[in-house]
Design a protein with these regions (language model features):
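Bacterial Sec-dependent N-terminal signal peptides
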Residues: 1-10, 14, 204
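Outer-membrane beta-barrel domain signature
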Residues: 7-11, 40-45, 76-82, 112-117, ...
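Start-of-domain marker
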Residues: 8-67, 76
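Residues that define the transmembrane beta-barrel architecture of outer-membrane proteins
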Residues: 14-16, 48-50, 83-87, 118-124, ...
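Residues on the lipid-exposed face of transmembrane beta-strands in outer-membrane beta-barrel proteins
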Residues: 20-24, 54-58, 68, 89-93, ...
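Repeated loop/turn-to-beta-strand initiation elements of outer-membrane beta-barrel proteins
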Residues: 28-34, 63-68, 98-102, 135-138, ...
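Transmembrane beta-strands of outer-membrane beta-barrel pores
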Residues: 36-42, 70-76, 95-99, 108-112, ...
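Predominantly the C-terminal beta-signal and adjacent terminal strand-loop region
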Residues: 140, 151-152, 156-205
Length: 205
């Protein structure tokens, strides 16, 4: 029992994520956005990666939204930084029940790495958002990562659980603060990553 427990939860780390994003509605229902982020690991002492997300989202109706995003990112693999390119395709469903909003997102993620495997994942995320007060919302989410072109007995590779708050500072500026617990699964020595993430988002009229 103790051996199994430490094999599952003994390998842990802590990191911090910070990001600034800008978005604008270019036509009715179509938004474009840019998001710059930095992420640390090794107990938040090492810069693990930084990247820029450039994307667009289209609101089909009040229930469905689609999106596409391109992410050039620099990753630190201990011997230096390497450039990777990542592409996302999203389909998100939303159901609003008074002050509670329910979300289900399916994301296809593919990464281009020079001289390496180009992994493709499907990510399924469930999210519940609750309005607490004017401009203040709380949320809880859980996301599952499936390696579509991987090998092994199971394609389920990672879980990302999170909870946090969103606060509208003004009509144009929003802040978010959240905790994430990212756990590798179906691996001999899985890593559990604990993350505190802070984000600022500005909407251009």
């Amino acid at each position: 029992m103790p051996t199994v427990f430490f094999a599952q939860f003994g390998n842990q780390d802590f990191g911090t994520w910070g990001g600034v994003s800008v978005n604008k509605e270019v036509v009715d229902g179509l938004n474009v956005d840019a998001d710059f982020q930095v992420r640390t690991d090794d107990n938040s002492t090492r810069l693990n990666q930084y990247f820029l997300d450039l994307g667009a989202k289209y609101k089909v109706n009040k229930y469905f939204r689609t999106g596409i995003s391109w992410r050039p990112r620099m990753t630190n693999n201990w011997s230096g930084y390497k450039l990777e390119n990542r592409l996302y395709l999203d389909l998100t469903g939303k159901l609003k029940l008074n002050d509670i909003s329910l979300y289900l997102r399916s994301r296809i993620q593919t990464t281009s790495k020079r001289n390496a495997e180009n992994p493709t994942y499907q990510r399924i995320r469930f999210k519940v958002k609750i309005k607490l007060d004017k401009g203040l919302k709380a949320f809880v989410q859980d996301e599952f990562f499936f390696h579509l072109n991987g090998t092994g007995t199971s394609n389920y590779k990672k879980n990302r659980f999170g909870l946090g708050f969103e606060y509208e500072i003004s009509d144009y500026l929003q802040m978010s603060l959240k905790y994430l617990r990212i756990t590798e699964v179906n691996q001999a020595y899985p890593l559990r990553m604990n993350v505190i993430a802070l984000g600022l988002s500005y909407s251009i009229e």
